């Protein structure tokens, strides 16, 4: 039933009342007219000042003038502006952003610092879970190149400060690890060292021996009495283990020779 049909019904009722000479409105006709008017106001669009259900915009699209619409427009303008900027403008923008970030990080509290690191770690974890093998390799290559460039530019004071921080962080990590984690770390380091030694050139091997000797001399000069005692105990245990393995290897070789001679019938005295 359209709005026009409803109005026609009302007009027909009024004409019937006039033709019957009924000047006063009956309660029944008044109730019928009120019902029809309510129907028109409720179900027909544009019949009242209240918005109709079909006139309400969809919530999936940002409304004009809303915060979501404003942020979407700003992001679009920012993408267009960055696409048109030159390399110098890009470097300037990144430098300003880095300076602002350093300033903001220097003013944050210890709790805010920990929360920021936690958010960054969680975001990196989610990103690395979704990346492919090629993306992971490209990320590692870029990170290694970025680190090499940074190390080439840093001063002696910055380098010393970085080494001290790395050493302190490593000491804390070693103190917090469990015996199982320590054993796994040593095994991984030993395997990585063996792989590196296999692929190194003679010059790299000589440089490695010199570095190891210099590092050992420096360590022996600065070690405490407790460290010296622990080192001697470890050296003695390692020597015993190597001696046992060597004897076991010789025994296995002798057993293999005897077994082969018995199978061939060439063992003397038989």
UniProtKB/Swiss-Prot annotation:
Membrane-spanning residues: none
Record's compositionally biased regions (Polar residues): 21-40, 260-270
Region (Disordered) residue spans: 1-270
Biased composition (Basic and acidic residues): 1-10, 64-74, 83-100, 113-131, 154-169, 182-215, 225-238
Protein name: Uncharacterized protein C05D11.13
């Amino acid at each position: 039933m359209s709005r026009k049909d409803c109005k026609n019904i009302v007009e027909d009722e009024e004409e019937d009342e006039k033709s019957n000479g009924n000047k006063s409105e009956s309660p029944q006709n008044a109730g019928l007219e009120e019902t029809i008017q309510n129907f028109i106001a409720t179900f027909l669009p544009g019949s009242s000042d209240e918005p109709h259900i079909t006139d309400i915009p969809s919530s999936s699209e940002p409304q004009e003038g809303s915060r979501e619409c404003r942020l979407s427009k700003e992001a679009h303008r920012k993408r267009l502006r960055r696409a048109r900027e030159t390399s110098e403008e890009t470097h300037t923008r990144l430098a300003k952003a880095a300076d602002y970030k350093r300033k903001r990080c220097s003013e944050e509290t210890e709790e805010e610092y920990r929360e920021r690191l936690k958010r960054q770690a969680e975001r990196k974890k989610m990103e690395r879970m979704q990346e492919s093998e090629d993306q992971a390799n490209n990320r590692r290559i870029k990170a290694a190149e970025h680190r090499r460039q940074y190390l080439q530019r840093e001063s002696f004071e910055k380098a010393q400060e970085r080494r001290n921080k790395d050493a302190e962080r490593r000491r804390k990590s070693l103190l917090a690890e469990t015996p199982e984690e320590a054993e796994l770390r040593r095994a991984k380091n030993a395997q990585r060292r063996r792989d590196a030694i296999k692929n190194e050139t003679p010059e790299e091997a000589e440089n490695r021996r010199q570095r190891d000797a210099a590092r050992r001399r420096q360590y022996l000069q600065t070690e405490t009495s407790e460290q010296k005692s622990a080192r001697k105990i470890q050296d003695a245990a390692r020597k015993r283990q190597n001696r046992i393995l060597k004897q076991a290897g010789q025994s296995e070789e002798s057993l293999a020779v005897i077994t082969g001679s018995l199978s061939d019938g060439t063992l003397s005295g038989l």
